[in-house]
């Protein structure tokens, strides 16, 4: 069905030509819209400081939700923060690297910059590529992403293709490896000429099960003298909404996989470099190249993923797959209180109170803003159920979500004495002011989707009276802000529990509290009704 498709635009290097971009997008939107979003690959800002400043300050408005990558030239790095940010209501900087799960169901991977060893925001290296792949290694049955956005081209992209680019383009070997693992259905890149490669296969004919094909589209820069194409429109049906037969249908002009020879050569060289002095491979090593990567979603034991780009020294990244995916074999399932169709409730590690729960998505989704409507609806059902449970105990429910330096949707739900409710709003706003940012009160008819774009960090708290406090000013945002406010003297008076690591319980105690939570929640547990249907 057409409604299952996302209608998107993608453009090449803008290079500061904002007026021309907006004019073209406005015309295209009127003639062929509405479009869900515009993605810009390549260099976005230009040399006109005045225009750049107007865009950053929101004085130049974009007609549809627009998402941009980071710099590919170090001269523009100063214009970008370290984390993703919403420059204006319709302009979002995605960050250096990450995954964007859209409300329409698309999974979009992105990596900014050029391959290099510099630590500047304009460069990426092997560690960046590995970190981007980490959350995908935990997805059971992972078969690919819908879209991959990169600033530059992958190396050897034109190999085995009948049509060739008008000019040879330098490519990144690391991006070739990334594309081989991600298997995107569409791969858009900038910093080059216009080139729509014939689709390539992601499997070996007769040797491997059929997989979907990949379409690589290189886009030229706005205002290029050759007047090459710099804007591309397409309808993309999310992979997760497609039957296997539809997904793996092979176009008649599909070519062989372009990166095989390159990656086999690299793998062979890496194996040789690991050999010891007598020409033998080190014990336990094995030479193997798999085009598909971890098809069954086995964990790879690498560092945890962070969507926001640089986040301090890399050796400080937590190790392992996503802690909150139920499909993760290492998930602490003894903490689970109830499991719905799209979400589940669990007691967090180091709870603030004995009835502190969090509601998380069953699938790997980053935030409420990027969640499909059925996930958001089930979060509300859990919220209503835990509110009833709190009322029965003479308590009130406070909820908050921090979509900042997190990789999995989690809404914290904490019960407090009703007598403490009056101090909540002032406690939140005072703590925010002390931390250097402002919490705004959302209007009664405003939703999170009205306040922030997908992929942008934010914090939101909902008070027992239904009012919501919100910020997207995340510079210097305290990671324990929500817990800090609730643990303060006027509310729960347990300031020793601000950091969850300082109050982790023994497993036996966790099991005891979870069993009590299940018992208390049972009269309000709508998931039990779902199971009986």
Swiss-Prot record:
GO biological process, one term: mRNA splicing, via spliceosome
CDD domains for this protein: MPP_CWF19_N
GO cellular component: post-mRNA release spliceosomal complex
Annotated segments matching region Disordered: 290-314
Record-linked InterPro entries: Cwf19-like (IPR040194), Cwf19-like_C_dom-1 (IPR006768), Cwf19-like_C_dom-2 (IPR006767), HIT-like_sf (IPR036265)
GO molecular function: RNA lariat debranching enzyme activator activity
PANTHER family: CWF19, CELL CYCLE CONTROL PROTEIN, CWF19-LIKE PROTEIN 1
Membership in a protein family: Belongs to the CWF19 family.
Name of the protein described by the UniProt record: CWF19-like protein 1 homolog
Lineage of source species: Eukaryota, Metazoa, Ecdysozoa, Nematoda, Chromadorea
Gene symbol of the encoding locus: cwf-19L1
């Amino acid at each position: 069905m057409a409604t299952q498709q996302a209608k998107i635009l993608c453009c090449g290097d803008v290079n500061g030509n904002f007026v021309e971009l907006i004019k073209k997008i406005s015309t295209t939107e009127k003639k062929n819209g509405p479009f869900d979003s515009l993605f810009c690959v390549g260099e976005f800002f230009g040399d006109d400081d005045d225009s750049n400043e107007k865009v950053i300050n929101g004085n130049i408005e974009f007609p549809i939700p627009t998402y941009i990558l980071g710099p590919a030239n170090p001269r523009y790095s100063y214009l970008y923060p370290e984390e993703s940010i919403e420059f204006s209501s319709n302009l979002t900087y995605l960050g250096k690297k990450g995954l964007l799960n859209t409300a329409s169901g698309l999974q979009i991977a992105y990596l900014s910059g050029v391959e290099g060893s510099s630590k500047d925001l304009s460069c990426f290296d092997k560690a960046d590529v590995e970190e981007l792949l980490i959350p995908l290694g935990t997805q059971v049955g992972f078969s690919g992403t819908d879209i991959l956005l990169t600033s530059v081209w992958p190396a050897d992209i034109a190999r085995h293709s009948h049509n060739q680019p008008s000019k040879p383009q330098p490519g990144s070997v690391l991006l070739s490896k990334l594309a081989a693992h991600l298997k995107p259905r569409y791969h858009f890149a900038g910093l080059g000429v216009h080139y729509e490669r014939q689709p390539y296969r992601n499997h070996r004919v007769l040797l491997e099960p059929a997989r979907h094909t990949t379409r690589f589209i290189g886009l030229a820069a706005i205002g290029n003298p050759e007047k090459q194409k710099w804007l591309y429109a397409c309808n993309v049906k999310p992979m997760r909404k497609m039957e296997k037969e539809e997904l793996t249908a092979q176009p008649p002009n599909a070519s062989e996989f372009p990166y095989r020879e390159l990656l086999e050569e690299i793998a062979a060289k890496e194996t040789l470099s690991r050999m010891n002095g007598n020409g033998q491979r080190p014990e336990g090593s094995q030479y193997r190249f798999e085009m598909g990567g971890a098809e069954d979603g086995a964990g790879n034991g690498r560092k945890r993923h962070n969507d926001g780009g640089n986040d301090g020294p890399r050796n400080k990244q937590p190790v392992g797959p996503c802690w909150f995916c139920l499909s993760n074999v290492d998930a602490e399932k003894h903490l689970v209180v109830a499991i719905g169709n799209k979400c589940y409730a669990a007691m967090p590690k180091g709870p603030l109170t004995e009835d502190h729960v969090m509601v998380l998505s069953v699938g790997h989704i980053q935030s409420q803003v990027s969640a499909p409507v059925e996930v958001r609806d089930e979060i509300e059902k859990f919220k209503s159920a835990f509110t009833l449970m709190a009322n029965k105990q003479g308590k009130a429910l406070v909820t908050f979500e921090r979509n900042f330096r997190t990789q999995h949707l989690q809404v914290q739900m904490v019960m407090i004495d009703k007598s403490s409710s009056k101090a909540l709003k002032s406690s939140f706003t005072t703590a925010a002011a002390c931390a250097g940012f402002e919490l705004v009160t959302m209007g009664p008819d405003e939703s999170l989707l009205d306040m922030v774009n997908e992929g942008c960090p934010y914090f939101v708290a909902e008070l027992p009276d239904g009012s919501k406090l919100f910020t997207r000013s995340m510079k210097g945002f305290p990671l324990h802000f929500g817990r800090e406010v609730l643990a303060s003297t006027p509310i729960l008076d347990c300031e020793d529990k601000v950091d969850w690591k300082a109050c982790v319980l023994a497993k036996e105690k966790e099991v005891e509290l979870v069993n009590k939570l299940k018992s208390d929640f049972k009269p309000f547990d709508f998931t039990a009704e779902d199971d009986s249907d």
